[in-house]
Amino acid sequence: MSSQDVLIHSDDPCHPANLICTLCKQFFHNNWCTGTGGGISIKDPNTNYYYLAPSGVQKEKMTPEDLFVMDAQTLEYLRSPKLYKPSACTPLFLACYQKKDAGAIIHTHSQNAVICSLVFGDEFRIANIEQIKAIPSGKVDPVTKKPMALSFFDTLKIPIIENMAHEDELIDDLHKTFKDYPDTCAVIVRRHGIFVWGPTIDKAKIFNEAIDYLMELAIKMYQMGIPPDCGIGEEKKHLKMASP
Amino acid sequence: MSSQDVLIHSDDPCHPANLICTLCKQFFHNNWCTGTGGGISIKDPNTNYYYLAPSGVQKEKMTPEDLFVMDAQTLEYLRSPKLYKPSACTPLFLACYQKKDAGAIIHTHSQNAVICSLVFGDEFRIANIEQIKAIPSGKVDPVTKKPMALSFFDTLKIPIIENMAHEDELIDDLHKTFKDYPDTCAVIVRRHGIFVWGPTIDKAKIFNEAIDYLMELAIKMYQMGIPPDCGIGEEKKHLKMASP
Amino acid sequence: MSSQDVLIHSDDPCHPANLICTLCKQFFHNNWCTGTGGGISIKDPNTNYYYLAPSGVQKEKMTPEDLFVMDAQTLEYLRSPKLYKPSACTPLFLACYQKKDAGAIIHTHSQNAVICSLVFGDEFRIANIEQIKAIPSGKVDPVTKKPMALSFFDTLKIPIIENMAHEDELIDDLHKTFKDYPDTCAVIVRRHGIFVWGPTIDKAKIFNEAIDYLMELAIKMYQMGIPPDCGIGEEKKHLKMASP
Amino acid sequence: MSSQDVLIHSDDPCHPANLICTLCKQFFHNNWCTGTGGGISIKDPNTNYYYLAPSGVQKEKMTPEDLFVMDAQTLEYLRSPKLYKPSACTPLFLACYQKKDAGAIIHTHSQNAVICSLVFGDEFRIANIEQIKAIPSGKVDPVTKKPMALSFFDTLKIPIIENMAHEDELIDDLHKTFKDYPDTCAVIVRRHGIFVWGPTIDKAKIFNEAIDYLMELAIKMYQMGIPPDCGIGEEKKHLKMASP
């Protein structure tokens, strides 16, 4: 085995090279990355190498051989697959690693994200739903020093930025959201999809699932006339049709 | 194998420790417990031990090693996984075991439950649908002494309680529904999800599936203008658009 | 192996005892027979024995051991599982075998069937859709003597009967539809589901899939304002919103 | 093994005979080819033989033995399965091979295609969505000489032709779209489904997935009042209900 291939071959299903492939397949069946859309990057917590899904590959058929591996210090590719180009998302993934201390980033073309970007203005908002408690608040518990989640009574706010012709052109707006929304773990790109990150791939996956659930729910609420961030007990007066 | 691990290791796919994992995976793919939401508890009919899914775990990846086991008499944990905390639902599960003689409890973040909780007031109601016959009526057949199901002409009523910041705060309202709805096998928590129980895990699973089917159908009926509990033959006069 | 068990044990995946289980599992994941709803019966073309799914079983977990086997001549059970009762649908299945020369019958609680039964009156109608060509017309090709399918320009009509408290009470209305719709291969039961039959289980499965596809499409058309049986080119004038 | 069977037996999962079966099964579970609808044809890049799915087969159960193989020069069948007839789509597939230099053609009964054909006139249009970038523009990069994809700011246009009683009657309209839309990789057939082709089966699959995603999105946009080809920033003024 070449020294490059050692980087991607492991019997451990939780090795980044294996996990990216498993999750891309799972996300494909969620309609999140059909037609080669979307992607995942994971930082190996042992080596600090970045593992990156390539551009243009069918996400449900991806294998570890298809992955790029990058050194986090030099930003040089330690391994490049012969058949593929690096994903155009790579600069965005690097920004999340460098500015948000991310351990993994998930990018999908979720239709829920695209629809929310058409309905909402500059910010997706939903409040008072149990699933919000899966999302980090950005605050730290003063006693345990652990990161605190949003509470049921909080409003989840996710910034929405405009899409550009090429993904690397999103970088300025991405950096701006890092400043304007220092606690967000996600950015919606209008008419495009969503980027979600977390300190580990497990966390990023949980955040992404919870946010997609909340976007799906927000669309259903909107279609029934209920503002997704309306107060508890206010739903009925917004309903387009009388409560049964 | 330690004495604690004996509790969770079995070759029998119907052993509670295995069944909780199998069903959590199945429910994950139903969008009922993504983002670590939801949970299941089963009472082992042989030992009367309670098996409980932990807090914060990805439900489709759960293994028997992740489970808590509790003694039904002392309410002490016979086994605690190192990595996880007990679910905040535990007091609610215990209430169902103790007050409703449950053999298993299923908790999901089903979007159908959340949407029904936004549209309905204090009670979910649906009538005159065949699937209602899967739900117990609370009555006992005077001849066979077996529990009787609802009939096609009955109205299924499920109480809806308000959500709180923490799940253990739901306990008072849960006890109140036990009094006000002595025959119910489920409680919807507004903007949160649903709890469903039964004398066995098989029954609880069937009740949960049937109720979710009925909530999904009720939402579709509501969206077309038909009150889900309207009389047979009354549908057409409620339709928003003329019958084709 | 007992003589009764010989009836249900076969290595052939197309043996009726195996095929009923495979299809029930597949239909469960289509949301057609959750909560123990629905069922399948197949006539073994070699023995003329009827294989019948039992009442109350979780359809995705069913095994050949759970099946009833009935002699087509004597209508006596050649095999009865210890744990289950015969399905209440059995008299309806027998009527399809005896009056329609069916080789298999599929019964589902498809929500598309229930919704169509709420929107349509006594007859489901859809016209001018390619998938209609999967449904038999009841006519025979004068040259090849083979059964002919509906054409693209035909209107598929499926009778809708009222539900009763118990499934065996549907028998009179079922017989009436056999007379009024001599060419139909399906009957919708209002607020309940659908029965579909065919000369073989393969045909019954294809008819059921095509009809469910057409009911799903009809609901979408209805929701956009288009009568599902409207003429080709008439769609646009029915649209609730202007064509984009 | 007979010389005919050599054509369809291979251990390579990417051999056309294996790939057609794998993809038909995958597409069946997408609701794209239930009830025997739809089909796939692949040209073997090594032999130039056409592999064709037969008529009337259950697409999720298809095996290599069910396939037709045709010589691209003589258009004679090198292999015909005993049980099946050639698909009525065969002349349409041949037209795509001969006039569009296709390497593979996918035909589905996608409900998204049928609904779009009911809502749109002679052309499906969607603009300014990231997923559009998966579709070829028909232009060639002047430097790299590689085919260029549509850009985010482009409008994807897919012609819609009228359905006929028999699929071979579509041939004239198909040829007309080849002239009127020289760059299209797909044709929607009203009230029927869609044909999508590409230089390889991998490309055809990616195009088909991306187009289905875009048709699904267009229907959702239309239902909310947003013209799928409206300008960026114009969405809000089209919304049926106010932005939340």
From Swiss-Prot, chains A, B, C, D:
Reaction(s) the record says it catalyses: 5-(methylsulfanyl)-D-ribulose 1-phosphate = 5-methylsulfanyl-2,3-dioxopentyl phosphate + H2O
Gene3D superfamilies with a match to the protein in the record: Class II aldolase/adducin N-terminal domain
Keywords attached to this entry: Amino-acid biosynthesis, Cytoplasm, Lyase, Metal-binding, Methionine biosynthesis, Zinc
Covalent S-S links between cysteines: none
Nucleotidyltransferase keyword on record: no
GO cellular component, one term: cytoplasm
Transmembrane segments: none
Binding-site residues, Zn(2+): 107, 109, 192
Active-site residues (renumbered): 130
Predominant location category: cytoplasm
Pathway assigned to this chain's UniProt record: Amino-acid biosynthesis; L-methionine biosynthesis via salvage pathway; L-methionine from S-methyl-5-thio-alpha-D-ribose 1-phosphate: step 2/6
Source organism, top-level taxon: Eukaryota
InterPro entries the record matches: Aldolase_II/adducin_N (IPR001303), Aldolase_II/adducin_N_sf (IPR036409), MethylthioRu-1-P_deHdtase_MtnB (IPR017714), Salvage_MtnB_euk (IPR027514)
SUPFAM superfamilies recorded: AraD/HMP-PK domain-like
GO MF annotation, one: methylthioribulose 1-phosphate dehydratase activity
Family: Belongs to the aldolase class II family. MtnB subfamily.
Protein name, as recorded: Methylthioribulose-1-phosphate dehydratase
Species the sequence originates in: Saccharomyces cerevisiae (strain RM11-1a)
